[in-house]
From Swiss-Prot:
Gene Ontology CC: chromosome; cytoplasm
Residues that, per the record, bind Mg(2+) 1: 424, 498
Keywords for this protein: ATP-binding, Cytoplasm, DNA-binding, Isomerase, Magnesium, Metal-binding, Nucleotide-binding, Topoisomerase
HAMAP family: GyrB
Function, in words: A type II topoisomerase that negatively supercoils closed circular double-stranded (ds) DNA in an ATP-dependent manner to modulate DNA topology and maintain chromosomes in an underwound state. Negative supercoiling favors strand separation, and DNA replication, transcription, recombination and repair, all of which involve strand separation. Also able to catalyze the interconversion of other topological isomers of dsDNA rings, including catenanes and knotted rings. Type II topoisomerases break and join 2 DNA strands simultaneously in an ATP-dependent manner.
Metal-binding as UniProt keyword: yes
Compartments it resides in: Cytoplasm
Protein known as: DNA gyrase subunit B
UniProt subunit comment: Heterotetramer, composed of two GyrA and two GyrB chains. In the heterotetramer, GyrA contains the active site tyrosine that forms a transient covalent intermediate with DNA, while GyrB binds cofactors and catalyzes ATP hydrolysis.
């Protein structure tokens, strides 16, 4: 076969064609949502550049119903005059020419952001449609683009007193796949971040689809950012260290505070763009921090008195810091700007941090004492951990040559083809060992709940047998000097626990361990959660496995509706087999059951059920109407209730809203309880949903409709009772087994349902928002009780998967 390679093979992609051909080079991943959201941030960064130049105070980001998004600012507005070189408007040049903009002449913007330095032209190229509005010179200019090409010239469509730019774009869903919807959490995180970094700039985010909005406006700047990041932590000093200064044309702004935790959280920004991999600003900060703290400790006699040596890790334990620099023409290691390599930044950071930190330590003796105490304790613990590690090595516990005895290893030696199951308990571990494929599946049983590493110090973690066994089995070591993810022995680590509360707890403890000490395993996509079935269903000698409670409920519903019809005694035409109407009503009823559970503290269940069979309560201004409504309600309630309870109807006058509100009193022996239908409940989402289903049921009752299956009829009048009876009768000859533990399955079942690559289901653990994840682990797994209590109080009623 002849293979020629000549000049004809060299393709020149002109204009924005290169962007469309290789979008990932310019905007990031187009499948996982990264690139989609970077489109928004590219436009927002232009508005922030206007703010940095002193011309913009307000930015509005709106997610529209049609999945388009708009960004509007009150800056100067994109220039509209004709560009000398291109012969078209400057606005059109910016929208259609790569690397065209005001940031390249060093006069319009002294410093600027922009994640990839390609700006809004790339956003235009990757949009199905884009609308440009410019408010400038008391005129409104408008232009529309389709797939990156202008459909009209920039024209005046009106007049205005405001200035600024508005860009609305519709992403091209042929380019952006998988994740195609804008995510509130991702957008709000970045916009909140920008509001802290640029104090006194208001950034308003509005989601028209979900009807939620938030205004990000921070006057406190980086100090307020530190307070936000340390919200669920316990700071050891109240005064936040902060300075803003300039050296060698590098503007440096730093804020930091130590807390009682053990994690180091340092966030680096250059011209508002985050650097996940740090760079010269981070290395300059770290070296200055270590040197300054050592100088202070030596000068004050702490080192001699305590006979210690302080290293960088000691000074950064429990430290939350923000490093924000602004520099003209920064240099990065790659197009994505994840690491700063500008050499002049390091010396500027070292000099300024040394100067201002030493001043802070000398002027705040009590704060300094708390910080020094923390650093000395960290040094002692580090040395104790080193001695403990050396001791365990001598005993062979952490010797990576010898694997733990509990591990049943696989034959495969290629990590990419190997997987390890972390199994809850020896019993399930035994079944898993028999079920596995020995060629590439290893089994490590874990006894009981492992240590909560969020609360424990490093040396305590190393003393935990289950943790050290796990570390040894994985083979990648632990700790800053010994941890090497390249030595990981398995590229699939599968957590397999029981489907009960204890199993969830063990799974959470393991996730905490991996997130805090081996985050690269998560970032590389090596961590999974097995999905063993919760139910085994046997029907007509056929067995099927059902993964969870929701799937089981759907299975019960579909089984109950087999050969089921709706009939009417008065209207013979109403006869629908496996009908959509009944499915829809039952689905609504399931939602109502969830609502009943959430508001059961406000009303007893029998009152909530009775609401389904009464007309909507409205016209609260009419006392006679309200009185009749509540009296009819109580009469029906009393008929269906036991004789031990006495119900009475009352109304109360709400003087504030000038309305009448019905009230039910329930008396049992000497105890009397009151339940009021107040205006807040009547206007609530919950009551509207109850009424919506109730209206449908009442219409069916009026038409004498009933449910019929296998010559049995079920009345609509007591829907809850008869629906449950329908399901009960449908499952008379069906055997349902609920697995509480993995040990209840024999090896064959475990292989078939959970371990066979051909049939198993697994959840892959991914990491998107580091700040949110940090806070979640700190809140739920940390040693502060109050934030956890507030979290539970806030979200308890939203919980649906509760194991009772």
């Amino acid at each position: 076969m002849k293979n020629t390679y000549t000049s004809s093979n060299i393709k020149i992609l002109k204009g924005l064609d290169a962007v469309k051909k290789r979008p990932g080079m310019y905007i990031g991943n187009t499948d996982d949502g990264t690139g989609l959201h970077h489109m928004v941030f590219e436009v927002v960064d232009n508005s922030i550049d206007e703010a940095l130049a002193g011309f913009c105070k307000n930015i509005i980001v709106t997610i529209h119903d049609d999945n388009s998004i708009s960004i509007q600012d009150d800056g100067r507005g994109i220039p509209t005059d004709i560009h000398d070189e291109e012969g078209i408007s400057a606005a059109e040049v910016i929208m259609t020419v790569l690397h065209a903009g005001g940031k390249f002449d060093n006069t319009s913007y002294k410093v600027s952001g922009g994640l990839h330095g390609v700006g809004v032209s790339v956003v235009n190229a990757l949009s199905k449609k884009l609308e440009l509005f410019i408010y400038r010179d008391k005129k409104i200019y408008y232009q529309i683009y389709k797939n990156g090409y202008p459909k009209n010239t920039l024209s005046i469509i009106g007049y205005t007193k405001i200035t600024g730019t508005k860009i609305r774009f519709w992403p091209n869903l042929e380019i952006f796949t998988n994740v195609t919807q804008f995510n509130w959490e991702i957008l709000s995180k970045r916009l909140r971040e920008l509001s802290f970094l640029n104090s006194n700039v208001s950034i308003y985010l509005d989601d028209a689809k979900k009807h939620i909005n938030e205004n990000f406006y921070q006057q406190g700047g980086l100090k307020e950012f530190i307070i936000y990041l340390n919200k669920n932590k316990k700071p050891i000093h109240s005064k936040i260290f902060y300075f803003s200064s300039k050296k060698n044309n590098v503007e440096v702004e730093i804020a930091m505070q130590w807390n009682k935790g053990f994690q180091e959280n340092i966030y680096c920004y250059t011209n508002n763009i985050p650097q996940q991999d740090g760079g010269t600003h981070l290395s300059g900060f770290r070296s200055a921090l270590t040197r300054t703290m050592n100088n202070y400790l030596d000068k004050e006699g702490y080192i001699k008195k305590n006979k210690i040596n302080i290293i960088g890790d000691d000074t950064r334990e429990g430290l939350t810091a923000i490093i924000s620099i602004k520099i003209n023409d920064p240099k990065f290691s790659s197009q994505t700007k994840n690491k700063l390599v500008s050499s002049e930044v390091k010396s500027a950071l070292e000099s300024l941090v040394n100067e201002f930190l030493m001043e802070f330590l000398l002027e705040n003796p009590q704060e300094s004492k708390n910080i020094v105490t923390k650093i000395i304790e960290s040094s002692r613990v580090r040395n104790a951990a080193r001695r403990a590690r050396e001791m365990t090595r001598k005993k062979g516990t952490l010797d990576l040559i010898g694997l733990p005895g509990k591990l049943s290893d696989c034959q495969e030696r290629d990590p990419a083809l190997s997987e390890i199951y972390l199994v809850e308990g020896d019993s399930a571990g035994g079944s898993a060992k028999q079920a596995r494929n020995r060629k590439n599946q290893a089994i490590l049983p874990l006894k009981g709940k492992i240590l909560n590493v969020e609360k424990a110090r490093y040396e305590k973690m190393l003393s935990s047998q289950e943790v050290t066994t796990l570390i040894t089995a994985l083979g990648c070591g632990i700790g800053k000097n010994e941890y090497n993810p390249e030595k990981l022995r398995y590229h699939r680590i599968i957590i397999m626990t029981d489907a009960d509360v204890d199993g969830s707890h063990i799974r959470t403890l393991l996730l905490t361990f991996f997130y805090r000490y081996m985050p690269e395993i998560i970032q590389r996509g090596y961590l999974y959660i097995a999905q063993p079935p919760l139910y085994k269903v046997t029907k007509n000698n056929k067995t099927r496995y059902i993964k969870d409670k929701n799937t089981m409920e759907n299975y019960k519903l579909s089984t109950a509706l087999e050969n089921t019809i709706l009939e009417s005694n008065t209207d013979k035409e109403i006869k629908i087999k496996c009908n959509y109407t009944l499915k829809k009503i039952i689905s609504e009823y399931k939602i109502i059951q969830t609502i009943f559970f959430k508001i059961k503290d406000n009303f007893p269940l029998n009152i909530l059920n009775e609401m389904l069979y009464h007309p909507k309560l409205n016209n609260l201004n009419d006392e006679v109407y309200v009185n009749n409504w509540i009296n009819n309600f109580v009469i029906q309630l009393q008929k269906k209730s036991s004789s031990t309870r006495n119900y009475s109807a009352h109304i109360t006058f709400n003087s504030k809203d000038k309305i009448f509100e019905p009230l039910i009193k329930i008396q049992k022996n000497a105890e009397v309880k009151e339940y009021k239908f107040d205006i807040t409940f009547i206007n609530s989402y919950e009551y509207q949903k109850i009424y919506s289903l109730g209206k449908k049921l009442q219409e069916m009752i009026q038409k004498n409709i009933h449910i019929k299956k296998n010559n049995k009829t079920y009345s609509i009048k007591n829907f809850q009772k008869n629906f449950e009876l329908l399901i009960q009768n449908s499952f008379k000859n069906v055997l349902i087994q609920r697995y509480k533990g993995l040990g209840e399955m024999n090896p064959e079942q475990l292989w078939k349902t959970t371990m066979n690559p051909e049939t198993r289901r697994m959840l892959k653990i991914t990491l998107h928002n580091i700040d949110t994840t940090n806070k979640l682990f700190n809140t739920l797994m940390g040693d502060s009780v109050e934030p956890r209590k507030l979290f539970i109080e806030l979200y308890a009623l939203k919980a649906s998967n509760i194991d009772i």
